[in-house]
Amino acid sequence: MNTFEMNRRQTLLTAGMGVLSLGMLGMVMGRDKLDKRGKAVAAEKSCIFVLLCGGPSHLDTWDMKPYAPEEIRGPYRPISTKVPGMRINEMHTQLAQLTDHFTLINSMTHPGSISNHFDAMHHLLSGQSVKRVQQGVPDDQPYLGSFITKYRPSTRNIVSNAWLIKCVGPPVFCAPNIGIGGYLGSAYAPVFVGSAQNHPAMANFTPPPIYDLGDEKLLAKRRTLLSDIESNVLSKDAIGKDWSDLREKAYDAMTRPEGREAFDLDHESEQTRDRYGRHPLGQNLLLARRMVEAGVRYVTVNGWTGQAPHDTKGPPSSSWDMHGGNMGMGNAFGNGSYGMGFCLPRLDQALSGLLSDLKERGMMDNTLVVVTGEFGRTPNVLTQQPPGRQHWPKCFSSILAGAGIGGGQVYGKSNKHGAYVTSDPIRPEELAATIYHALDIPLNDPQNNSGISRPITTGKPVMELFG
């Protein structure tokens, strides 16, 4: 092809990009490649990843040590659950009746000496316990949602990978590379939905602008004009035809109602919205359910429970970094925004609402739910006032449910003070491999027409977690 023809094509492609948003084009790119391979996805599975940004205390939630000294066990009591022998925090009254729906892992661990949010988040979300590249560098390891978008893009008119409310950042808590897609590229990065000032528990919540058509008549005219130009210039060129097909799919995705409706909680009954809880975490989990129901493959939900009513300055968009007084966050066992008395009942309501709703709608078989922080908390309660706990990567707890995960079991153990794993450790690598396996993502298979030449994880799925 001569230089003139190349420049002419580039000009037309640039013009076409102006008609449709880059986010919308990225939404359909993976689906376009899937169609060309001619391979059908056996089951359209999705994942809701509830990220408890900051790292909750495992000792005060799901791995309680009631016989340990008070300075270790903390002030809360465990309660019995539907599963004999499984005991959880007394404020998890609704989850206690749903323990047959999920598996509780009490042996999560980070190898090495991680102690900060950035590295722990990066290892957890990338599924690799390797040193991260400098923040924002595109050659770094992609996160789970990016790989899932690459291998199993949505086949419907909606995004494949979404993140509901960024954790506080930068530089606090926020995973360093959530917005770039790592070495896969920005087309596989998540679409960000909402913020601390714009979330679905608010009456005026505004969804992302990827479905904003602007002047629809003008858009239609531009589409017609571009089609006329392409028919004369690009129709004889294979790449040009591919572009035309991709543009039409993007236009279709923008103009059909399914994508927009997924973000509209007005379609839900008042009873359902109340069931999840009228707070950021509850309404975001309801939004996540609507999104996977509409075809989104991977939704990360920031586990922010909101700002306590009496707090004049609560957390911007995180809840679980409960240091107590040594960082000015208030009593970790109190009722403030960084207090378990405020956060745990809201987590109980929102998560039990999600699990029950998925079960009733017949969505559990094809929806994986993961609930975890990036690490746990120190066995010893800090002695300064008000009390709290520091970061602890050696041992923490997670919940998995759906997509073949067995219910009613506790996997792994920690020692008598919850400081170290004593059996069946699960690193970020094993957790990632388990998630990929549950979603039918091929592990370490660079020949799968994906263009990926590096393994997506070095871990192996924990098959004992599956029912």
Q: Would you name each region that the model predicts?
A:
Residues 1-467:
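Ligand-binding pockets and gating/stacking loops
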